[in-house]
Amino acid sequence: MKKKLFSILFMLLAVLTLTACKNKEKESEEKIVKEEILEGIVDGYKFTVTDEVTDRVRIQMNNGDIMLVVLSNSQTPITIQNFKNHVQKGTYDGLIFHRVIEDFMIQGGDPTGTGYGDDSIPNIKGEFISNGVKNDLSHTKGVISMARANDPNSASTQFFIVHKDSDFLDGNYASFGKVFAGLDVVDKIAKVKTDGNDRPLTEQKIKSIKFITVEKA
């Protein structure tokens, strides 16, 4: 009887220990996901999140992956100011890359997460050649550009990051900056499995986009 009772107690203790370990692992995983990374080093660049509006931003994914972007195109002031406004408002925080095509681009920034956009958000003028605006920034790998509908002036919040050089987009989309550190994250997202609508089967969520200061590490 004592042996049987001891066996039961031992089994219960083992189950409780295993459960505690699993809960600890889960808690650790959730902590990684929930943490805002305020400073760090990516590809030799040291970044620090700042409340000041700058020309560089940190895109943090929910899994902790980081991309650093420079908003560098002086020919697209409207586009850059629009993007900065949405970063300030926190528009992009918690949104997903809803459309991913390997060897082409990854697209996100839609508050609805569908690609149809939010009609309540104002559109901006498309700053590209076919719309009467000079824009010499070619759509090479890592370039960030505004997504839009057929109307050349229909861009609002959605953007895409080029995965493979796509100069056929030049002249028709407002390219306004480039990923200068963390291109491996673009590669990683671009390679995820997708459904027939190019939507990732595993959610690719942006934790936040924040302004940063940058220096060489």
Language model features by range: what are they?
Residues M1-K2:
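N-terminal secretory signal peptides that target proteins for export/translocation
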Residues L5-L9, L16-A217:
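Cyclophilin-like peptidyl-prolyl cis-trans isomerases
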